[in-house]
Amino acid sequence: MPFLELTLSCSEVTLPRFQNALDDVGALAVTMLDADADTSNERAILEPGVGEMPLWDRLTMTALFDGDSDALVVLAALEAFDPGLDWSQVAFRMVEDSDWERAWMDLFKPMQFGERTFIVPWNHALPEAADTPEAAVVRLDPGLAFGSGTHQTTALCLRWLDSLAGSGELQGRSVLDFGCGSGILAVAALKLGAAGAVGVDNDPQALLATADNAQRNGVDAQLTVYMPQDEPVQTYQVVVANILASALDALADTLAARVAPGGRIALSGILHGQEDDLLKRYAPWFDQLRCERDEDWMRIDGVRRG
């Protein structure tokens, strides 16, 4: 059976807190390794004395969760358990048996969001409903477990973009996809009629995935990707941020400053119950703030005050 694997870096000082958090949210197993292994800074721990438990200064922790676990739910629970720890560098992946990837490809079917937006894996024929001039079709690799449209946070954003396109508020507009991941939202926005898009993410692999998906969908000339520190300071008519509630709170000033007067914003990655604080956080800059729910997840959207 597959497992969800979490990896993070910590110090000997913060290790107990990370360990307590992982145990609390249901980790099946936790292992620790020297983060400097196979480098000149590697330190061997051979035979500790009685009652001693020496550890490395820098550690890599790996935790396993049940394969049915939702990575974003796990991460949100960890942040809620100990918000004082830095969870921003946590990485997830599926530890799978040899048949998992093929099973995922078979399970990942074409999906429709709103009236005209379709996410279609490359190994599937185009659905009849998507084979129209009005349809916005994004083709994705079925191996992408996250940012593929299957998670509620992504689905909430895709439906929002589709509704903007339906009301004519996306045609010819500039778009910022903050925390772009696979780039699915930026690519979908371009397919729906946006003039140009910028993807921002702190993971270089995410930027590569976004650029690759843009190229494969024929919109690479309209999309540029940046690390957060390299993003040009400018405003956009449409901003979408599908990250976690803690990051949305911390980045409120930054995200608000990126939205042009009269522009639209959508915030996702918010668990039900976290929306009230974020509504208050963004109220100084945005009117018409409203929420939409999909199972345990919420989206907030609004209009930038002039």
Curated annotation (Swiss-Prot):
Gene3D superfamilies: Vaccinia Virus protein VP39. One of its GO terms (molecular function) is protein-lysine N-methyltransferase activity. GO terms for biological process: methylation. It is found in: Cytoplasm. One of its GO terms (cellular component) is cytosol. It comes from the Bacteria. InterPro entries: Ribosomal_L11_MeTrfase_PrmA, Ribosomal_PrmA_MeTrfase, SAM-dependent_MTases_sf. It catalyses: L-lysyl-[protein] + 3 S-adenosyl-L-methionine = N(6),N(6),N(6)-trimethyl-L-lysyl-[protein] + 3 S-adenosyl-L-homocysteine + 3 H(+). Keywords: Cytoplasm, Methyltransferase, S-adenosyl-L-methionine, Transferase. SUPFAM superfamilies: S-adenosyl-L-methionine-dependent methyltransferases. S-adenosyl-L-methionine binds at T154, G179, D201, N242. It holds the Pfam family PrmA. Its EC number is 2.1.1.-. Its main location: cytoplasm. Methylates ribosomal protein L11. PANTHER family: ELECTRON TRANSFER FLAVOPROTEIN BETA SUBUNIT LYSINE METHYLTRANSFERASE (PTHR43648:SF1). Belongs to the methyltransferase superfamily. PrmA family. This is Ribosomal protein L11 methyltransferase. It comes from Xanthomonas euvesicatoria pv. vesicatoria (strain 85-10) (Xanthomonas campestris pv. vesicatoria). The gene is prmA.
